[in-house]
């Protein structure tokens, strides 16, 4: 939350080659008693879905990682997004909507458990547009007992370097506290 000191808590979706996540409460990453808190990638979103590397089916990883998007679209991310934004193929729109639908499903469910803003971060974050955020919000809030406002979804600015920066900030914080 270095870039958002006003936030006390957040749910972080790290949209990298492999999906990752974090739960932040009271300005600290929640580790959990067995150190696996925030492993959003293995939340089941479809019990009959694709086989995940963990051995289960339908994990969010199989729908919302950058690898899953590339596999679905049949092309690298760096080719996919320019073609998508230029509206070159309705097929690409379908792949992106499917991606966003699964992401919104996970966000909607997590919002019921953890009442906190959502941070979209990682490799795919720079590709998100205002239109994508609006789409997510519509799908998160449809039929939801508790809705999210637009200012509760934040898009990270560090892209694929987010994990490295986050790891470094741990030591920066320790140094600052020691001074």
What are the functions of these language-model segments?
Residues 1-60, 67, 172-179:
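Phosphate-binding/catalytic loop of phosphoryl-transfer enzymes
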Residues 2-4, 60-179:
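ATP-binding/phosphotransfer module of carbohydrate and carboxylate kinases, centering on a glycine-rich
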């Amino acid at each position: 939350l270095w870039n958002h000191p006003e936030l006390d808590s957040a749910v972080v979706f790290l949209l990298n080659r492999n999906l990752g996540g974090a739960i932040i409460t009271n300005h600290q990453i929640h580790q959990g008693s067995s150190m696996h808190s925030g492993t959003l990638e293995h939340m089941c979103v479809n019990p009959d879905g694709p086989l995940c590397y963990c051995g289960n089916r339908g994990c969010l990883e199989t729908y919302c990682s950058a690898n899953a998007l590339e596999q679905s679209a049949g092309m690298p991310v760096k080719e996919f997004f320019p073609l998508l934004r230029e509206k070159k193929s309705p097929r690409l729109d379908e792949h992106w909507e499917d991606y966003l639908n699964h992401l919104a499903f996970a966000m909607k469910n997590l919002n019921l458990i953890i009442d906190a803003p959502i941070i979209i971060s990682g490799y795919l974050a720079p590709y998100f547009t205002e239109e994508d955020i609006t789409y997510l919000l519509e799908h998160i809030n449809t039929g939801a007992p508790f809705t999210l406002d637009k200012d509760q979804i934040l898009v990270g600015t560090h892209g694929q370097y987010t994990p490295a920066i986050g790891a470094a900030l741990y030591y920066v914080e320790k140094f600052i506290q020691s001074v």
